[in-house]
Amino acid sequence: MAEKIYEPQKIEQEVQALWETNQTFKATEQEDKEKFYCLSMFPYPSGRLHMGHVRNYTIGDVVSRFQRMNGKNVLQPMGWDAFGLPAENAALNNNTAPAKWTYQNIDYMKNQLKSLGFGYDWDREVATCKKDYYRWEQWFFTRLYEKGLVYKKNSTVNWDPVDHTVLANEQVIDGRGWRSGALVEQKEIPQWFIKITDYAEELLTDLEQLEDWPEQVRAMQKNWIGRSEGVDITFNLSENAADISSFDVYTTRPDTLYGVTYVAVAAQHPLALHAAQTRPELAEFIESCKNTKVAEAELATMEKKGCDTGLFAIHPLTGEKVAVWVANFVLMGYGSGAVMSVPGHDQRDWEFAQKYGLPIKQVVEPSADEPQECDLTTAAYTDKGVLVNSAEFNGLAFQEAFDAIAAKLEALGAGSKKVNYRLRDWGVSRQRYWGSPIPMLNLENGESVPVPSDQLPVELPEDVQMNGVISPIKADPDWAKTEYNGQPALRETDTFDTFMESSWYYARYCSAQNQDAMLDPTQANYWLPVDQYVGGIEHAILHLLYSRFFHKLLRDEGLVNSDEPYKRLLCQGMVLADSFFREDESGKKEWFSPADVDTVKDEKGRITQATLKADGKPVEHGGMTKMSKSKNNGIDPQHVIDLYGADTIRVFTMFAAPPEQTLEWVDSGVEGANRFIKRVWKLTQDHIDALDGDTAPAIDKTALTGDQKTLRRAVHRTIAKVTDDVGRRQTFNTAVAAIMELLNSLQRAPQSTDQDKAVLREAIESVVLLLNPIAPHMCHILWHDLGHKNDIETAPWPAVDESALVEDEKLIIVQVNGKVRSKITVAADASQEEVQALGLAQENVQQFVDGKTIRKVIYIAGKLLNIVAN
């Protein structure tokens, strides 16, 4: 029979059409079958898939297909995280509506996903910008409001004073509005919040349940939640400031209380605003703070600035006066907006005190068993030690002092122990257009009420014109006008943070077509929690934390009965590619696509020379960097599919690096993956006639030769390794390497007897089955070519034959004085005496021990015999 040619484009289109016709990956609940829900983070429909998507979704698809072959009822859905600011920007640039741009992108990217052979149940597809999705989000928000978990308060935003609009952080460039160029101001406006802090302790303690999450992600969430044990302390003012007589601070170091020499408050603290009325320099300082947005992460590195309020607080234990300062490192949104300052034992406070000439007092010294320098003229002493200069608390260590000082404060009515969290409530208001409208109504009396459920969804108009200045729904007064109980009302014109949509999409997939409810609890509880979640570590905190929070809210609404949404998490690494640029006289870099650059490499594959194809002139090599539009070094997946086929991309992305590490996109590696696929194809085609499925004999385990046993052992060791690598360890690269190694063994396999053919057939079928999750198109065809009537998608994962792993014989290395002198084959159960006798009988061994005394014999069972002689 003429050899069948490997034509990836033809094969892949044929197989994909068959999957679609047969609805191969459609999932239904089957109570008698163990389920497996595999989910990859859904993409933002930006226009085209990038290689980061391809890697993410290939991992998810490999896991899904593996679990399906292992008898699980697998759900693997896909959808679109479709709201967000980029659509507004693209709509402006392309003079179109965000909705139209988004839906066009979804159509294109969906075809790309199909062309890569991902086994999704497309009947469960969701797009978060469609009203049948966000209506339930709106409904759920109103339920949270009714439960007291939603509230409205003023919060600071970036305000463009020229365009009179709120800007996202990404729209502020060097402190100016991206469109107007005006200096951005900080402005307080009312916004909606959800009380995630009510769940802070549960979100923290339930991290212990997530044993199959990367430790790094759990640590990041733990730090973000930021549980601390401390003391709330009340400082009275020496004189009332308007109607303010005292204020509270929170500290985790009450042991340093006697070292307080000043207190610092935020620029927006009521005390600061009161004092500024009579102190122009303070008013000016507050104004400068107001127009400088400070992220919490920047506090440690920013320049510390402050201004004296002229007010004094009374130390709660000593009765001494301490100055009240306004400081730019105190944020009103965190804690009470006031901190006690201990410059002797806090480096930030020390730097501030040095700058403004404030007193520095030592109240902690190193313990006797920890000799350390404690020179407060050079830096604060920040370690926990033993108290000094602290009245009756002198000599106490940290925990004793903590408890004793807290008890005294409590007895005086000046403080109490408190557990605090760094986590802040979730502000869900966005002053953008392309998002789900927040389902609240503002009444004439100033009250806010939820939109009645029978009036949901509050629909976002899609046929709009963007002007880049103001949201179309804010610009249209008629859209906001409505009634509530016969009285005039105005709709909320803010939209939800897009993290709202991505916080519960995993659950909607369970009953995506349900028009009558957010979730069907029966379906949701069958599929949830997600067994395997795949996505980038950049989502470790916000998305994954909000999603965990949402799951608990869904549970408390009776919609799901589990505590956590995702059992196992895999965070894939970034995809890197070579980058190339030229720098002009001003230092500005122009980046060129790798496809437009010719390179010369040394013997180690390092680029030594790069020239632009267009003009033949040199360009600089910027190294391997994350594929990005800014560096112009993205590789279009479609180009690789057209060149090599989807299976080649899939094999390369699985083989080139461990999944959690960065993957370097190297053309030679892609070519290598393609050669491997062709080798599998050719080996199978070369042996199809000899391995006819109808006439091939069965393996007779009792009549196998040594070579046949060796080959079967290699096959079943590979099955065991690949099963473990894919299922438990998720080291897909080593799984592919093991299949490659087995393939090398098969190239030399004999096929002269029926048993040779039977063993070889088992081996080749095993290769096809093991490779199927990774290169499913080719394996689908080869499975049929091997004579199988059923599709490989219904074939079980190959089982390990434990008897094949048993070795009848062992190869023993024989050394004399640590140097290899011979190799011998012995029975697997041979004793040390038998091995030693056979080893010493070898001619090459004898010549190195003749005339010498054997001092010692070292035997490592089944592996090595070392004879020590002199």
Swiss-Prot record:
InterPro entries found in the cross-reference section: aa-tRNA-synth_I_CS, aa-tRNA-synth_Ia, Leu-tRNA-ligase, Leu_tRNA-synth_edit, M/V/L/I-tRNA-synth_anticd-bd, Methionyl/Leucyl_tRNA_Synth, Rossmann-like_a/b/a_fold, tRNAsynth_Ia_anticodon-bd
GO cellular component terms given for this protein: cytosol
Keyword Cytoplasm: yes
Record keyword Signal present: no
Catalytic activity: tRNA(Leu) + L-leucine + ATP = L-leucyl-tRNA(Leu) + AMP + diphosphate
GO annotation terms (biological process): leucyl-tRNA aminoacylation
This enzyme's EC code(s): 6.1.1.4
Binding site for ATP: 629
Subcellular location(s) per record: Cytoplasm
Entry-linked NCBIfam families: leuS_bact
Family the UniProt entry places it in: Belongs to the class-I aminoacyl-tRNA synthetase family.
Protein name: Leucine--tRNA ligase
Source organism per UniProt: Pseudoalteromonas atlantica (strain T6c / ATCC BAA-1087)
